[in-house]
Amino acid sequence: MPEGPEVALTADILEKYFKGKTLEYIDFISGRYSKSEPEGYDDFIANLPLKVSNVDTKGKFLWFELFDPNDKSNKWYIWNTFGLTGMWSLFEAKYTRAVLSFDNELMAYFSDMRNFGTFKFSNSEKELKRKLNELGPDFLKNDDIDISKIKKYKQPIVALLMDQKKIGSGLGNYLVAEILYRAKIDPHKLGSNLTDQEIENLWYWIKYETKLAYDSNHIGYMVNLENESSKIGRKNYHPNIHPTEKEFDFLVYRKKKDPNGNKVIADKIIGSGKNKRTTYWAPAIQK
């Protein structure tokens, strides 16, 4: 599942190619929206063409900002979430669901094998701000998050980190597993039971892992933008963090052993019934 770093890098690439370009049409050619169009779609189409002014993200939420060059007060927003398998490309990939047509024959495509990704169209800046305010601070983009709030909650730390509203946003299954392993924290441990030192260490590894995943990431969640990813500069998030690895890699996520040979357990901790989510951890390391 694409997480904060992939979504942020995707937005960087989309902005590089499409900022200042004019969107002429968007068509849903397959998937969940081919029969039932997203909220606001008809009104949005009626206002095209529109020029892209910005592509941005918060956590795992991406949005386009567009305006009418003849009436700059006429602003529109495309909301997008990636779900489990959503990704953007500059070519028509397998499982393409949405096609965005720009001037000068430029195209952007959204593919989604499992169809959990979402779109919404809105001309309300207030509605967008309300959506953004519902999300916690972006773990990749913010240096001053008060994660000591973790101690307020008698919930497993793995659940608190994956909750997009309580502490921060942008972390999912793979990042939380890797962060807790690096921080040597048992994912079952309640937030209220973490020591100040554990929280300080946790915050360091959140910054470290999100930065590393953004800077150099080839784990497969944005393969359709692999070529473009290698050509674009990275923003200097968490400037005081200096990863020693050249590339992000999984140490415990979907592994049977960690790099030192310690057993990795796949544990269902979050959710209930069939919807429980699996996390990976090494009991010999994480206490």
Swiss-Prot record:
Recorded superkingdom: Viruses
GO MF entries: class I DNA-(apurinic or apyrimidinic site) endonuclease activity; damaged DNA binding; oxidized purine nucleobase lesion DNA N-glycosylase activity; zinc ion binding
Reactions mediated catalytically: Hydrolysis of DNA containing ring-opened 7-methylguanine residues, releasing 2,6-diamino-4-hydroxy-5-(N-methyl)formamidopyrimidine; 2'-deoxyribonucleotide-(2'-deoxyribose 5'-phosphate)-2'-deoxyribonucleotide-DNA = a 3'-end 2'-deoxyribonucleotide-(2,3-dehydro-2,3-deoxyribose 5'-phosphate)-DNA + a 5'-end 5'-phospho-2'-deoxyribonucleoside-DNA + H(+)
EC number: 3.2.2.23, 4.2.99.18
Positions annotated as active site in the UniProt record: 2-3, 58, 277
A Gene Ontology BP annotation from the UniProt entry: base-excision repair
PROSITE patterns: FPG_CAT
Disulfide bonds: none
Keywords: DNA damage, DNA repair, DNA-binding, Glycosidase, Hydrolase, Lyase, Multifunctional enzyme
A Pfam short name: Fapy_DNA_glyco_C
Record-linked InterPro entries: DNA_glyclase/AP_lyase_DNA-bd, FPG_C, FPG_cat, MutM-like_N-ter, Ribosomal_uS13-like_H2TH
Family matches, as SMART domains: Fapy_DNA_glyco, H2TH
Family named by the database record: Belongs to the FPG family.
Protein name: Probable formamidopyrimidine-DNA glycosylase
